[in-house]
Amino acid sequence: MKMTSVIAITPKEGSADDVKQLIVDSRADGIEGLEKYSIVLTREEQLLVINEWVSLDAFMDYVNGPHNMIELIEHLCNRYDEENVCKAYSGTVIHEELAN
């Protein structure tokens, strides 16, 4: 079953482009099981990284693996709390449809 994860990041003022580029560069060689991802800049100046995974297993392998995206960008972001530089959401895709 396909999986989607969304990471919400609040870049420090003026650093959204740098954060975006670090994410893009860190994924340049691909990530096993990641079908596609989008980076959205919201009106509230947040970055949303929307990841589409081939399966829950692929997502869990990434989460439990040696990835370093957060470590790469945390110095450019405002913290949500003492421990977290982002908010993360994930779940299985229960409906998907292409628009006409």
Sequence positions of predicted segments:
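An amphipathic, aromatic/His-enriched active-site/gating alpha helix that lines ligand/cofactor pockets
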Residues: 28-37, 52-87
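Active-site-flanking beta-strand signature of metal-NTP-handling nucleotidyl enzymes
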Residues: 2-10, 48-50
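Short, surface-exposed ligand-recognition loops at beta-strand->loop->(often short) alpha-helix junctions
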Residues: 8-21
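Non-catalytic surface loops within mature trypsin-like serine protease
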Residues: 11-13, 55, 95
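Short, low-order "capping/linker" segments at domain edges
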Residues: 89-100
